[in-house]
Amino acid sequence: MALAACGGGGVSDPPLSGAQALAFAYFQKCVNPIFVTPLQVAVGGTTTTKTCAAAACHASATGAGGAFRIIATAQPVDLSSAANTPAVIRTSDLYKNFTSALGETVIASPSQSLLLNKPLVRNVFHGGGVVFASTSDSNVRLIEYWIANPVPQGQDEFSTAIYSTMFSPAFNPSSPNSSTCNSF
């Protein structure tokens, strides 16, 4: 994106070099479902059931939950379809959820990531209360694993290099339900 600068010249962001990415396939299969699944949440001594994507929380259009936004109706992307190029995937609602979640992470450092610290209420306020009671919660383990295992340096979020390490057995886009999500 070019910005107008003093003197009529243009200013643009430098290209990223050496940046690491998190895996879209793992997010789609293992992390995004957490945000749309009803969870027990403790707020002010009361336990209720709601989703992260609830209207009063992180719903895309109406949520009060800060910058983190989730589109509850985002549909999985068929990663085996040649028609779903990275450019096409990047226009999907699920990819919007992916980028929103990325904004709450410190790649390769789950303990510094708001995506975990807020719902654990770990040294930071979360208006939605305690979503995960402890770091041993299976949902925490999945999110931790995603953040701690970026794709290899120099590869983008669609890299298939992680399919054999993040899933058991190796992830097969043609049969996404044939593997399970690895976690810590």
Language model segments and positions:
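Aromatic- and Gly/Pro-enriched helix-to-coil junctions and flexible linker segments
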Residues: 6-184
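Bacterial N-terminal signal peptides
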Residues: 1-4
